[in-house]
UniProtKB/Swiss-Prot annotation:
Lineage: Bacteria, Pseudomonadati, Pseudomonadota, Gammaproteobacteria, Pseudomonadales
GO terms under biological process: intracellular protein transmembrane transport; protein import; protein targeting; protein transport by the Sec complex
CDD domains: DEXDc_SecA (cd17928), SF2_C_secA (cd18803)
UniProt KW Cell membrane keyword: yes
Cofactor binding note from Swiss-Prot or TrEMBL: May bind 1 zinc ion per subunit.
UniProt binding sites for ATP: Q87, G105, E106, G107, K108, T109, D512
Record-given protein name: Protein translocase subunit SecA
Length: 911
């Protein structure tokens, strides 16, 4: 009730923050005259002075005004660009660990230099994170002269970079790279076998460009390093032949069945479900195909894998469409990012869905993979001591940024007021009427000489629009994932008078559409242009620029609304940069997916009440409100999905932290002998307690079982029954001591044979390998648990609580298994002295072989419906490690040593 009054009296929180920062801006401006008077050498020397002051106890906050003044002056001298006052506010926002929302063309890249320079003074490193390699290289090379002028080093990390080059990049004061590469390097570091192999330092401060894209759109995408699993390509092909025989079951709203079928599709949640008839029919077909035994059920425990394949095939055929969710290029299925319209090379759908699409498209089916290490962007970026970001559209997601990342959003005032006109949406009954209206708008704008950008949600729509324009004889350019290599060229001239560009959502995030076209691109196209040619190109551009401004600037036409208001705002933001004139209009129809699924009934009834005729449009605030309400509903649902996924992943994340801390401690330790002694004692105690329960009577002892366990776990054949027969005073405690002495003596003899130093090195290698192998199996077990945990809801149990409880139990088992398996391998192994040079060369060869056989990919985000985790088709960023195969014994065969373990878990790890 009082909120509007208080806001009027004191201003919004954002306005109060801006006022607070303006006081600091005044202090920065007061330093300007002093900085102008400094020579280049003196200005450069300020960096060393700041570092010295930090070492003496000053804080970065105390240095901020003077450091910003230094960065501003350096920008003027090196780049020819002076930071505006509002850009200083943006820099302060980033330094304070917030998200700066700045409109298109307000100079986000330049804003970043202020916070990056200030925080790099600490010497702990700053990471500048971008969405792709092109932007990382462009921004790093663009700003490198500024940072190097100020005495700071700049590095770029990228995929397939030589290890030494990558380590040097991470050791730099400022490191540029993509979110994927930073995340993968974190996982690689936690699979390293020595400190020297690691890349990253402690994660200090990150500035994320297009932060909404990375922390919101990519939040559900796990980063995974994986190894190859067994080949199931024949099964995918067989099931792909059966799926087209299934038909969809359709019901009207009143519950009237209009088509009997085998499965239902829920478009809102993007789920497909087999009904009873569908289950029966698919089981019959699988039995006829010889894939399911006669009388067997798909729901039998040993057939659940087959059921997963059936659902993957069904989703591939019914939910994933060519040129909408993916394209086929060079014999590969390339996924399309729904938020940007760009292809995502290397990214694959999980749970067999990608293979099912490959089978559908008659392509070569790539092998499935097994997870070796994983994390999510949500959990990776929360590891930084301080996090900040920049984007043109964050305010609509402010609640999510705050609740998940503890990041506040600051809307930075524009340097010049916005002059763009955003017209109300026009809604038509059919898509054909909508396209006819768009073409009429295009023709009208072209006669005025205005550049036009038509935004579409899919490649399919962009190509349909292009075909309509060809029929009308209208010249245009198409920009979508199929023609992404021409992106820079098309965007450069999209602002020329009368230029018409049809684009998916990829339309130039990170690039500006300049009114009149881009004169710099014209100059770059010439070989050794003369000063006269450059001057002429500039003069011609100035005329075109003025012509476009007088015509009304860039006109943005959207062919439909996206599920997210943020994506719509990004498209609008292409027009009206830095106070330029412009306009935007959204054209919709009741046949659009958003309208059909979420908003159609109310709007359709409203249009019927008005008695609308074919070709007529409705332009009313009620309609716009209904659409925005539908978008908020979708955004809220997607937020719930991301939040719920995070709650589940947080469980795995806590375990990941423990394992990675254990691993890093091992790598850092010179000697793990004491750890092995502790492990040996704990494993022995547990083994004895299993067969001789504490405070039990001798009649209850399982001596034969204890002898067998000691032979299996410690490679010790000890005559315990004989000892007991010969010594009446050998009780439980004295027996424990005797066994420990025997086992310790045997291991000491091993030390004497191999040499203490060699054995300590060997112990570390074995413990690391056992830990990695068991962690990999644990991840797989956790994955299976997560897939089926929603079923606990039917037993009136809370799936999240059950998941936490069972995960904890599994983790306890993992920690015990690490100890037990390490001791088992070390006890069974036969050691010999090895020449130190030979040993080092062997370890190096193994490390190089491991590195050369690793591969990386990305997998799609799982969707959640209420408590159900549906991770079929989850997108993943994945890196695959080698699978070792022994020539004599299969990895899954029993080990020759008689331990009862599989060869891969025993001597297969060290031979």
């Amino acid at each position: 009730m009082f909120a509007p009054l208080l806001k009027k009296l004191f201003g919004s929180k954002n306005e109060r923050e801006v006022k607070r920062m303006l006081k600091t801006v005044s202090i920065v401006n007061a330093f300007e005259e002093k900085m102008v008077a400094l020579s280049d050498e003196q200005l450069r020397g300020k960096t060393a002075e700041f570092k010295e002051r930090l070492a003496k106890g000053e804080t970065l906050d105390q240095l901020l005004p003077e450091a910003f003044a230094v960065a501003r002056e350096a920008g003027k001298r090196v780049m020819g660009m002076r930071h505006f006052d509002v850009q200083l506010i943006g820099g302060m926002t980033l330094h304070e660990g917030m998200i700066a929302e700045m409109r298109t063309g307000e100079g986000k890249t330049l804003v970043g230099t202020l916070a990056v320079y200030l925080n790099a003074l600490s010497g702990k490193g700053v990471h500048v994170v971008t969405v792709n390699d092109y932007l990382a290289r462009r921004d790093a090379n663009w700003m490198r002269p500024l940072y190097e002028f100020l005495g700071l080093s700049v590095g770029i990390v990228s995929a397939f970079q030589p290890p030494e080059e990558k380590r040097a990049a991470y050791a730099s004061d400022i490191t540029y790279g993509t979110n994927n590469e930073f995340g993968f390097d974190y996982l690689r570091d936690n699979m390293a076998f020595s400190q020297e192999e690691k890349f990253q330092r402690e994660l200090n401060f990150a500035v994320i460009d297009e932060v909404d894209s990375i922390l919101i759109d990519e939040a559900r995408t796990p980063l995974i390093i994986s190894g190859q699993a067994e080949d199931s390509s024949k099964l995918y092909i067989e099931i792909n032949r059966l799926i087209p025989r299934l038909t969809q079951h359709i019901e009207e709203v009143e519950g009237q069945v209009t088509q009997e079928g085998h499965f239902t599709i829920d478009e809102k949640s993007r789920q497909v479900e087999l009904n009873e008839a569908g289950h029966q029919f698919i089981e019959e077909m699988l039995t006829q195909a010889g894939l399911l035994a006669e009388g067997e059920s798909l729901y039998s425990a040993h057939n659940l894998g087959l059921l997963t394949h059936v659902y993957a095939g069904l989703r591939a055929h019914k939910l994933f469409h060519r040129n909408v969710e993916y394209i086929v290029q060079d014999g590969q299925v390339l996924l399309i990012d729904e938020h940007t319209g760009r292809t995502m090379p290397g990214r694959r759908l999980s749970e067999g869905l990608h293979q099912a699409i490959e089978a559908k498209e008659n392509l070569n089916i790539q092998a499935e993979s097994q997870t070796l290490a994983s994390t999510t962007f949500q959990n990776y970026f929360r590891l930084y001591t301080k996090l900040s970001g920049m984007t043109g559209t964050a305010d609509t997601e402010a609640f999510e940024f705050q609740s998940i990342y503890a990041l506040n959003v600051m809307v930075i005032p524009p340097n010049k007021p916005l002059a763009r006109k955003d017209f109300n949406d026009l809604v038509y009954l059919t898509a054909d009427e909508k396209y006819a209206a768009i073409i009429a708008d295009i023709k009208e704008s072209m006669t005025k000489g205005r550049p036009i950008l038509v935004g579409t949600a899919t490649i399919e729509t962009s190509e349909h629009m292009s075909n309509l324009l060809k029929k009308e004889g209208i010249d245009h350019k198409v920009l979508n994932a199929k023609y992404h290599e021409k992106e820079a060229e098309i965007i450069a001239q999209a602002g020329a008078p009368g230029a018409l560009t049809i684009a998916t959502n990829m339309a130039g995030r990170g690039t500006d559409i300049l009114l009149g076209g881009n004169w710099e691109a014209e100059v770059a196209a010439l070989e050794n242009p003369s000063a006269e040619q450059i001057a002429q190109i500039k003069a011609d551009w100035q005329k075109r620029h003025q012509q476009v401004i007088e015509a009304g600037g860039l006109h943005v036409i959207a062919s439909e609304r996206h599920e997210s208001r943020r994506i719509d705002n990004q498209l609008r933001g292409r027009s009206g940069r830095q106070g330029d004139p412009g306009s935007s209009r959204f054209y919709l129809s009741l046949e659009d997916s958003l309208m059909r699924i979420f908003a159609s009934d109310r709007v359709k009834n409203f249009m019927k009440a008005l008695g609308m005729q074919s070709g007529e449009a409705i332009e009313h605030r009620m309609v716009t409100n209904a659409i925005e309400k539908a978008q908020r509903k979708v955004e809220g649902r997607n937020f719930d999905i991301r939040k719920q996924l995070l709650e589940y992943d947080d469980v795995a994340n806590e375990q990941r932290k423990v394992i990675y801390h254990m691993r890093n401690s091992l790598l850092a330790a010179e000697n793990i002998g004491d750890t092995i002694v502790e492990f040996r004692q704990e494993v022995l105690d547990a083994t004895i307690s299993q067969h001789i329960p504490p405070q039990s009577l001798p009649e209850q002892w399982d001596v034969a079982g204890l002898e067998a366990s000691l032979a299996s776990d410690f490679a010790m054949k000890l005559p315990i029954q004989q000892w007991l027969d010969e010594d009446d005073h050998l009780y439980e405690e004295t027996l424990r001591e005797k066994l420990l002495n025997e086992i310790t003596t045997a291991y000491t003899e091993k030390e004497d044979q191999a040499g203490i130093e060699a054995l300590r090195t060997f112990e570390k290698q074995i413990l690391l390998r056992v830990l990695d192998d068991l962690w990999k199996d644990h991840l797989s077990t956790m994955d299976h648990l997560r897939h089926g945990i929603h079923l606990r809801g039917y037993a009136q149990k809370n799936p999240k609580q059950e998941y936490k409880r069972e995960s904890f139990s599994l983790f306890q088992e993992l920690l015990e298994s690490i100890k037990r398996d390490t001791i088992r391998v070390l006890s069974h192994v036969q050691v010999r002295r090895e020449d130190p040079i030979e040993e080092e060369a062997r370890l190096r060869r193994e490390a190089e072989e491991l590195a050369s056989r690793m591969q990386f990919q990305h997998a799609a985000a799982p969707g959640l419906e209420s408590e159900q985790l549906s991770e079929e088709g989850a997108e993943v960023a994945v890196a695959a490690a080698p699978v070792r195969n022994d020539q004599k014994l299969g990895r899954n065969e029993p080990c020759w040593c008689g331990s009862g373990k599989k060869f891969k878990h025993c001597h297969g790890q060290i031979e």
